[in-house]
């Protein structure tokens, strides 16, 4: 993901949007949710939603249990609560592509279910690259799977390939 944003410079790379080569992508084209939090502790939840141009009513419609924290500073939220706001702030604004790195980390199962519904809604309008260790959830919302190993990715044509390549057990 760092290569896509021009923060890491490999000897060779090929970045394309709909077949058109690009040296790097702009923030208006691609949004990225890093593994670690990015919102400063002193900002309030409602300010973050406003700064990202998001409709607070829509957010709290998806996550009604967080409405009571609307005016809370980010530093007082749990890791999972922070992740919910950051996930929504990156996924939902208009753009062409979204990169989500370990987006389900620290998030309670109820909110992961909501994330999956939001991913289904948003993937109609943009490309989404989702990396996460929660195989079942990733598989449920993915149109295609391309596991990474040793710096390369391979498209999965059949679920049995994931077992053969050692990504999942037969029981999964």
Task: Locate predicted features.
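Conserved ABC transporter NBD signature motif
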Residues: 10-26
């Amino acid at each position: 993901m760092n290569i896509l944003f021009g923060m890491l410079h490999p000897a060779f790379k090929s970045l394309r949007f709909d077949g058109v080569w690009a040296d790097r992508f702009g923030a208006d084209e691609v949004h990225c949710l890093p593994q670690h939090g990015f919102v400063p502790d002193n900002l309030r939840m409602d300010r973050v939603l406003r700064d990202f141009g998001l409709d607070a009513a829509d957010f709290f419609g998806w996550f009604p249990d967080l409405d009571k924290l609307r005016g809370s500073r980010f530093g007082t939220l749990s890791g999972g609560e922070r992740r919910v706001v950051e996930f929504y702030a990156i996924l939902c604004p208009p753009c062409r592509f979204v990169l989500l790195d370990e987006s389900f980390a620290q998030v309670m199962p109820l909110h992961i279910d909501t994330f999956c519904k939001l991913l289904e809604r948003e993937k109609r309008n943009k490309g989404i690259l989702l990396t996460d260790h929660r195989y079942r959830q990733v598989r449920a919302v993915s149109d295609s799977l391309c596991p990474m190993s040793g710096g390369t990715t391979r498209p999965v044509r059949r679920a049995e390939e994931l077992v053969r390549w050692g990504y999942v057990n037969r029981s999964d």
